[in-house]
Amino acid sequence: MRQIMIAVAIAVAVSILLTPALIRLFTKQGFGHQIREDGPPSHHSKRGTPSMGGVAILAGIWAGYFGTHLAGLAFDGEGITASGLLVLGLATSLGGVGFLDDMIKLRRSRNLGLNKTAKTVGQITSAVLFAVLVLQFRNPAGLAPASAELSYVREIATVTLTPALFVLFCVLVVSAWSNAVNFTDGLDGLAAGCMAMVTGAYVLITFWQDHNACVTAPGLGCYNVRDPLDLALIAAATAGACIGFLWWNAAPAKIFMGDTGSLALGGIIAGLSVTSRTEILAVVLGALFVAEITSVVLQILTFRTTGRRVFRMAPFHHHFELVGWAETTVIIRFWLLTAITCGLGVALFYGEWLAAIGA
């Protein structure tokens, strides 16, 4: 628990202190966000707000994770693990794709960055590298950072994926989560606040897995997760970085995270879900993100097949703005929904453990 608290503290400090420096730098360089002309009228006043604040979020995550391990040398903490590095590497790789996208938008002063093909290739490449590596690096107990079996709270033994199918599965998971968070990042503080809650839930889940790991505490209900404590540090550092960034990103936002932040944060959820064996449970924890990307898919499919739109605008947080909800009302209500789904997800996780031990 001490390591988790250190990770949060370092990440909050780095993010909250670095963000205003980025605001000054990007404002001086003229790196202002471009607004869609067909978006809600209230958003036009945000034109010129600095973007690429995801740099501060990623810096906070890196500092929180590695800073905690450096501090751990003083009290014999566990070292850096393959699981932690793979999740961090996935997030950083996707953040790099987002950074290129943001830079093109800012340099060309338009709301369109990388074309769809280039962006998709970047996401797929990141996912494939992650998928190939995450089944390697087995520890002395024979556990790899991930399992080829589909997982809810633990592996579902009846659903085992071949190596090729596992790679395709990871491409789907990584692409879905990175795009889902990207679509959600359309209102001040919405994505950062929701991410803080989802990763906070993952801190609880992975911390519990660490205390009930089959390697150290074999018995009913134990978990075959390779490095649960290190995953808890990644989750804690992410939550802390999002909280620090939210100080400046809350309405009215002084800076946006941009694709640099949203794609990276989607990678965090994807990586944590795969390495903690909770791919299906993650859908409950991040249900708001799932709803956002689903609204986009429904809007596109419905319009192409019927010529009509389900929502006034997608992602559907803009729909609620266009029907008269204030932006802050949408944000707070979506935060509340995320808190509820995170609570439900943690309850399902704990309930499964109780059932496993026969309680």
Swiss-Prot record:
Gene name of the encoded protein: mraY
Organism: Mycobacterium ulcerans (strain Agy99)
Compartments, record wording: Cell membrane
Predominant subcellular localization, coarse grouping: membrane
Transmembrane segments: 3-23, 55-75, 80-100, 117-137, 156-176, 187-207, 231-251, 255-275, 280-300, 334-354
Record has Secreted as a keyword: no
Protein task: Catalyzes the initial step of the lipid cycle reactions in the biosynthesis of the cell wall peptidoglycan: transfers peptidoglycan precursor phospho-MurNAc-pentapeptide from UDP-MurNAc-pentapeptide onto the lipid carrier undecaprenyl phosphate, yielding undecaprenyl-pyrophosphoryl-MurNAc-pentapeptide, known as lipid I.
Pathway: Cell wall biogenesis; peptidoglycan biosynthesis
CDD domains linked to this entry: GT_MraY
Cellular-component GO terms for this entry: plasma membrane
Example GO biological process: cell wall organization
GO terms, molecular function: metal ion binding; phospho-N-acetylmuramoyl-pentapeptide-transferase activity; UDP-N-acetylmuramoyl-L-alanyl-D-glutamyl-meso-2,6-diaminopimelyl-D-alanyl-D-alanine:undecaprenyl-phosphate transferase activity
Similarity annotation: Belongs to the glycosyltransferase 4 family. MraY subfamily.
Protein name: Phospho-N-acetylmuramoyl-pentapeptide-transferase
Lineage: Bacteria, Bacillati, Actinomycetota, Actinomycetes, Mycobacteriales
Cell division in keyword set: yes
Keywords: Cell cycle, Cell division, Cell membrane, Cell shape, Cell wall biogenesis/degradation, Magnesium, Membrane, Metal-binding, Peptidoglycan synthesis, Transferase, Transmembrane, Transmembrane helix
InterPro entries in the record: Glycosyl_transferase_4, PNAcMuramoyl-5peptid_Trfase, PNAcMuramoyl-5peptid_Trfase_CS
Top EC class of this enzyme: transferase
Enzymatic reactions: UDP-N-acetyl-alpha-D-muramoyl-L-alanyl-gamma-D-glutamyl-meso-2,6-diaminopimeloyl-D-alanyl-D-alanine + di-trans,octa-cis-undecaprenyl phosphate = di-trans,octa-cis-undecaprenyl diphospho-N-acetyl-alpha-D-muramoyl-L-alanyl-D-glutamyl-meso-2,6-diaminopimeloyl-D-alanyl-D-alanine + UMP
Record's bilayer topology term: Multi-pass membrane protein
